[in-house]
């Protein structure tokens, strides 16, 4: 895929970029290796000072950075601003807490003194997606740099200006120029990079296919990976739930970022007692969402990020309908320039159809009727994915049942699934391995060194 900025709201090419050659990649790897030797020895207060400076830049320049994001991948401008603000909060969170998360952990043994000591391991390769082009990077970079590691970013080919802007933020904040670098490279150049002995570990957020390929290469080299992959997340509503809030949140959970989110709700399991009423309200709200210019404050749904994604979503809808799914609203590309798709609702979706089995990365909801919590859990778990789940009920017994029985890395009760710097983020099954964020996230790329003093 060519490295280029294309405005998804218009289809206009904004700027093209040439991939780095081997010599430039080598120069940056040497720079990262050198920077690590210095950065790993910096004190936590010094690293925190630098990261707070990044947060300050993010807050000061949030509208300019948000504009770049919206132009490159079509996110609603107000959501882009919120994403930049979230990045700043993530930086401040790790600046305040990293030292505590990585304190030595004493152990009671037969030794005179024994403890666990955390040490950074070196340059980490981060392969990141376009859908949250700043936040996905910062939720890796903030803990990694606070831990004493250095970062090398291979960003998605359609957001090169976001990638370069992030690199400049770290440089301008005072980090060594090798502490965080962007590599403008093509997908075919990634394998050689992973194999390079100077790369000590790899983190990837992306598709199941990409995760499998990257994970296989890293495994051959015996390198640690964190993989955050796809999801087909369930959204369950029981009769005791706050009905109005559940409906409005369901619409938001399916259409956030135009449905292009790994933890967006995609399959909706509604209790039989409230199904008809829920479906009526849900379809009505989906149908009336305003689709259009992401810079318009009244717009609720922007474009999909690329024409390839648009075509893929439409193909999944068509195949699901051919398999027997019934279309209640939407189901078509919107005529005119840009990559816009109608908010879509499907019912009577067969289990062998794409809308049930695959991740649909667009504003397409599959709604199912269930008899009871047990059937909701069975259908929710009938997936190769297990990223997040949202369950709506005010029954304490049902809340405990969903929390314990849903096969996912995260369960949200009476709330929409979302990432938070204070909590670990990640999935099970084919949704990935490892965790980002929280204390777990910062420890993923550390040498947990056992110290025994006899």
What is the predicted role of each segment?
Residues 10-16, 199, 236, 290, ...:
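Conserved C-terminal structural/oligomerization subdomain of aldehyde/semialdehyde dehydrogenase
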Residues 36, 40, 55-62, 66, ...:
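Structural signal for hydrophobic packing residues in well-ordered secondary-structure cores
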Residues 150-152, 327, 410:
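A short hydrophobic/small-residue beta-strand
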Residues 11, 32, 47, 69, ...:
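Residue-level signal for inorganic ion chemistry
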Residues 1-113:
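N-terminal Rossmann-like NAD(P)+-binding subdomain of aldehyde/semialdehyde dehydrogenases
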Residues 59, 103, 107-245, 370:
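Rossmann-like NAD(P) dinucleotide-binding subdomain of oxidoreductase/dehydrogenase enzymes
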Residues 15-20, 35-41, 126, 235-237, ...:
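Short, well-ordered beta-strand elements within core beta-sheets of diverse protein domains
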């Amino acid at each position: 895929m060519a490295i280029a900025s294309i405005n998804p709201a218009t289809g206009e090419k904004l700027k093209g970029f040439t991939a780095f050659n081997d010599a430039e990649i080598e120069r940056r790897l040497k720079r990262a290796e050198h920077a690590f030797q210095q950065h790993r020895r910096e004190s936590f207060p010094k690293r925190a000072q630098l990261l707070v400076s990044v947060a300050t830049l993010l807050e000061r320049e949030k509208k300019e950075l948000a504009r770049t994001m919206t132009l490159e991948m079509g996110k609603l401008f107000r959501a882009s601003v919120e994403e930049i603000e979230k990045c700043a909060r993530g930086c401040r969170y790790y600046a305040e807490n990293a030292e505590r998360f990585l304190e030595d952990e004493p152990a009671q043994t037969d030794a005179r003194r024994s403890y666990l000591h955390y040490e950074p391991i070196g340059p980490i390769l981060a392969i990141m997606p376009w859908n949250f082009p700043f936040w996905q990077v910062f939720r890796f970079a903030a803990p990694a740099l606070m831990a004493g590691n250095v970062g090398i970013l291979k960003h998605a080919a359609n957001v090169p200006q976001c990638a370069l802007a992030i690199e400049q933020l770290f440089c301008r904040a005072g980090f060594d120029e090798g502490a965080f670098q962007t590599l403008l490279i093509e997908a075919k150049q990634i394998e050689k990079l992973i194999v390079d002995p100077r790369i000590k570990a790899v983190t990837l957020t992306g598709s199941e296919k990409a995760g499998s390929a990257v994970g296989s290469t890293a495994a051959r080299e015996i390198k640690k990976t964190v993989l955050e992959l796809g999801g087909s997340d369930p959204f369950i509503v029981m009769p005791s739930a706050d009905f109005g809030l559940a409906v409005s949140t369901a619409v938001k959970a399916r259409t956030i970022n135009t449905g292009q989110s790994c933890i967006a709700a995609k399959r909706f399991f509604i209790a039989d007692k409230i199904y008809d009423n829920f479906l009526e309200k849900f379809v009505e709200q989906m149908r009336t969402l305003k689709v259009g210019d992401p810079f318009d404050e009244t717009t609720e749904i922007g474009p999909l990020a690329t024409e390839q994604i648009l075509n893929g979503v439409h193909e999944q809808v068509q195949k699901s309908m051919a398999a027997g799914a019934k279309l209640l609203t939407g189901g078509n590309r919107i005529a005119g320039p840009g990559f816009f798709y109608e908010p879509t609702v499907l019912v009577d979706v067969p289990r062998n159809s794409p809308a049930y089995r695959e991740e649909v990365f667009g504003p397409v909801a599959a709604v199912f009727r269930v008899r009871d919590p047990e059937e909701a859990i069975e259908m929710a778990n009938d997936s190769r994915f297990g990223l997040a789940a949202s369950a709506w009920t005010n029954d304490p017994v049902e809340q405990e049942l969903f929390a314990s029985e849903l096969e996912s890395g995260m369960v949200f009760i009476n709330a929409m699934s979302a990432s938070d710097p204070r909590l670990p983020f990640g999935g099970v099954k084919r949704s990935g391995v490892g965790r980002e964020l929280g204390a777990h996230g910062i420890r993923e790329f550390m040498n947990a060194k056992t110290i025994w003093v006899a």
